[in-house]
Amino acid sequence: MYGTLLSDNRIQITQWIGLRTPALQNLSVAEGAGVGGRVVSTRRAVGIADYTRASVISHEYDQQIQDEGLHSVVAVPVIVQREIRGVLYVGVHSPVRLGDKVIEEVAMTARTLEQELAVNAALRSSDGGDRAGAKTGRAMNGAEWEQVRATHSKLRMLTNRVEDEALRKEL
C-alpha cells in the first residue's frame, strides 16, 4: 500500500495491491496514530509483528486492520528533499513476523521510490512545471504508481528467498 501525505500531515491510503476488503482503501491516518502515523511523526520505519497487540503504536485503526485481516505490518517513510511525501506499507494476512530481510527490502524500495520522485520533481522544475509544495494531497502519477508496482514485484521475488513457509505463502 502507499499512503500520500496530505497538507495537514495525515496520510491517505491512495494506492494498494492485495487488499482483500475495502477497509483500508482511502483510509485517512492521523499523524502519530497507528503505524503510518507513527512513521510520519518519527520519520522512521516501523515494523509490527502483531498489530492489535503492539505497544509502540496507538490503536485507532485496529478495527480496519482486523477487518482487512492483517497481522504484521511494516511501514517506511518516503522522503524527498527532506519532506515526507508518503508512507510505503507492507502487510501480511497471517500471524508471522516480517524479518529483517523484508524490512530492508521495503526500505530499499522506498529509497528507490524517493529517487524516482526526486528525478520527476527535478524534471518538472527544469520544464517550469514544478508544482509548489509536495504536500498537496495529489494522487500519484503513472511513473510513481509504476514504482509501487515494481515494489510489489520485488517483494514477490523476495518470496523465493524467504525460508519460513507461512511467510513465503503470505508474501
Roles of regions detected by a PLM:
Residues 1-13, 120, 165-168:
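Helix-loop-beta substructure at the N-terminus of cytosolic sensory domains
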Residues 4-6, 13-60, 66, 71:
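Regulatory sensory and allosteric helical modules in signal-transduction proteins
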Residues 41-45, 105-123:
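Signal-transmission/dimerization alpha-helices at domain junctions
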Residues 72-79:
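A short, aliphatic-rich beta-strand micro-motif
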Residues 86-87:
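Short glycine-/small-residue motifs
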Residues 91-106, 116:
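Regulatory loop-to-helix N-cap segments in sensory/regulatory domains
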Residues 118-171:
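Signal-transducing coiled-coil/dimerization helices and immediately adjacent hinge/linker segments
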